Amino acid sequence: MSLSAVLALPATAVPLAAPSAPDLATTDGFRRTCAAQPVNADVLRTDDERLAWAICRDVDQVRQLSTWARRGLARINHLQPEDQAAVVAEVERKMDEVRAEMRRTRLQLERVQLGAGRSLRIAPGQWQVDLDGDGELSVWERHFFALPKRRHGEPQFGMPSDDAGHYERHYDLNAVIDLDQSDVLWALSYHQFIEGLLINIRAFDVDLQRRELVLARPALLRQAHGLIGRGLATSGRLRDAVLAETDDQNEWISHPRQVNSVFPIPLEAADFTTWRVMLDQVGVLWHGRHLLPTTAGAGGLLGSLAPVCPAGQGLDIAKLYLQPPPAGTRASLNRLPAALTTMCRKVDAAHPLSPLPGRLERDTAGATGMSALRYLYWVN
């Protein structure tokens, strides 16, 4: 058939190549899938497409940050003291860039509703990226996204290694995960917390000459409070979703009856109870129903804060974020601002002191760090 004849056929008669399905379980598939991702998320139509887009964007964010850090450190080493303001401006610019990107991926994750179904199969150990931008793929870059082997006990953390044997001994290089809704909630809560933290930081400017923090954008504190509060709620939904699962197929976070999981720390029934208690206590503290004990004599985690509030009062975290001090309020890096005392509230039956700081101190006292690490794993 001639070319002119083909062009004369109805459009439905011309065979079109179907777009390839996302493949995040092989090295070549990961590269091909991520290279094909659109810049504009508005064209995404399915949950699989949204998840592939979010994963590829997040991995690329890690690449951009790693490259920026490598080149930035090289520049900083040659800067003079009078150039410190330029360094601060560059860091602030990068935080704003990352925050905007986190928001874009968060909005796509919020749209994913898998129900009881499954989505993509992913194999993070196959994601190989030139992270530092030097044009080479080092051993640590080939295995950067690999998952530590699943086991009880203290996980091993350290700087990236160029010893291939290290990864073979301590990492599950072939781990696969069949994504379900609990995995989406896990990723979403991380995005909400990290974006909220960056917004929190950008509420402040740094006065290098006077070594002070300046509350420059109080409205950002209100944004941060809302986003972090949503992260706490998402973590609660994540816990409930994991416990409700009845299958056992290439899981990420798993409940005690699921054994086919690659999550580095096996979670037991008591861990899920602690997860709920922690979320409850953090939630009421975050929303101002419990008060933070910051009176004279407070030790441990709050020792550097005391005394913010007089005896019989506690710090209202919600008020601090939702009714912040005025723009221009300054805080020395060595001394808390007097304006914080206006965030204190009388302790009463409706607003008791939070038991959370004491609980954290008891749980981590004399420990090797496992308790704190588990909290990070569970509650993001």
What do the PLM-derived regions correspond to, one by one?
Residues 13:
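A short, glycine-centered helix-capping/turn motif at helix boundaries
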Residues 16-36, 56-359:
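Short coil/linker segments at helix-helix boundaries
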Residues 38-44:
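Solenoid-like repeat scaffolds
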Residues 1-10:
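Bacterial N-terminal signal peptides
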Residues 368-380:
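Short, low-complexity, Pro/Ser/Thr/Gly-rich segments in the mature regions of secreted, periplasmic
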Residues 45-50:
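Short helix-capping/linker turns of helical repeat alpha-solenoids
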